[in-house]
């Protein structure tokens, strides 16, 4: 199977086609969004994906301070997949749980704050790594926050993404029950 490979800021990208090998034999598109109120930052990535990544479909991480890191994954039979845009941010009620919250770009060490979990968010997730870019160089990232479920994150050596990402840490723990302040 041949799939389009590209990465860009915004909602779409144009790239080149390449043959994909098993197990990454499905074409896919990932939209990522960082939404610290009141602005949002979006990137799009088209690549060869495995069926396990395709099954993830979406993830939402509550970073605290009204900020979210969200992803939408769509796989298809065509070379160039399309994905629906993001729905509005989930503004559900606080649920009494909390996690360390941080969005560190360009640094794997970032100062934490408390992220107050909402709705069904009862897990804490932590993702630390580097994204290798030609310009301006490697980009470190450190993401922590509340989430509803913990995806299995692995990068296969067979994909282009394994050559562009270095996952240092992926951890998922139960969120802490917060005590109401007097």
UniProtKB/Swiss-Prot annotation:
Pfam families in UniProt: PLA2_inh, UPAR_LY6
A GO CC annotation given for this chain: extracellular region
Entries under InterPro entries matching the protein: CNF-like_PLA2_Inhibitor (IPR050918), LY6_UPA_recep-like (IPR016054), PLipase_A2-inh_b-type (IPR016338), PLipase_A2_inh_N (IPR004126), Snake_toxin-like_sf (IPR045860)
Protein's UniProt keywords contain DNA-binding: no
Biotechnology: Monoclonal antibodies against this protein have been prepared. They permit to discover phospholipase A2 inhibitor gamma in snake sera and facilitate research to develop new antivenom.
Main location as per UniProt: secreted
Glycan-bearing residues: 157
Entry annotated with the keyword Hydrolase: yes
Subcellular location per the Swiss-Prot or TrEMBL entry: Secreted
Disulfides per UniProt: 3-27, 6-13, 20-48, 54-75, 76-81, 99-124, 117-146, 150-172
Superkingdom field: Eukaryota
Keywords linked to the UniProt accession: Disulfide bond, Glycoprotein, Hydrolase, Phospholipase A2 inhibitor, Secreted
Molecular function (Gene Ontology), one example: hydrolase activity
Similarity-based family: Belongs to the CNF-like-inhibitor family.
Record text on subunit structure and interactions: Heterodimer of subunit A and subunit B.
Function in brief: Phospholipase A2 (PA2) inhibitor. Inhibits the enzymatic activity of PA2 of Deinagkistrodon acutus. Also shows a wide anti-hemorrhage activities to D.acutus, Naja atra and Agkistrodon halys venom. The native protein is more potent than the recombinant one.
Name the UniProt record assigns to this protein: Phospholipase A2 inhibitor gamma subunit A2
Species of provenance: Trimerodytes annularis (Red-bellied annulate keelback)
């Amino acid at each position: 199977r041949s799939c389009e490979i590209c990465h860009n800021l915004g909602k779409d990208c144009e790239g080149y086609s390449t043959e994909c090998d098993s197990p990454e034999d499905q074409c896919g598109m990932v939209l990522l969004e960082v939404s610290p109120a009141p602005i949002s930052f979006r990137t799009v990535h088209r690549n060869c994906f495995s069926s396990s990544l395709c099954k993830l479909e979406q993830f939402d991480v509550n970073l605290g301070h009204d900020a979210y890191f969200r992803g939408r994954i769509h796989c298809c039979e065509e070379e160039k997949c399309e994905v629906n845009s993001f729905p509005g941010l989930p503004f559900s009620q606080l649920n009494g749980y909390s996690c360390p919250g941080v969005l560190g770009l360009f640094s794997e060490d970032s100062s934490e704050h408390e992220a107050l979990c909402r709705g069904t968010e009862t897990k804490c997730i932590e993702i630390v790594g580097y994204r290798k870019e030609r310009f301006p160089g490697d980009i470190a990232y450190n993401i922590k926050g509340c989430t509803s479920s913990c995806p299995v994150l692995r990068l296969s050596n067979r994909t282009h993404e394994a050559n562009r990402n270095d996952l240092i840490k992926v951890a998922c723990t139960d969120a802490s029950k917060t005590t109401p302040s007097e």
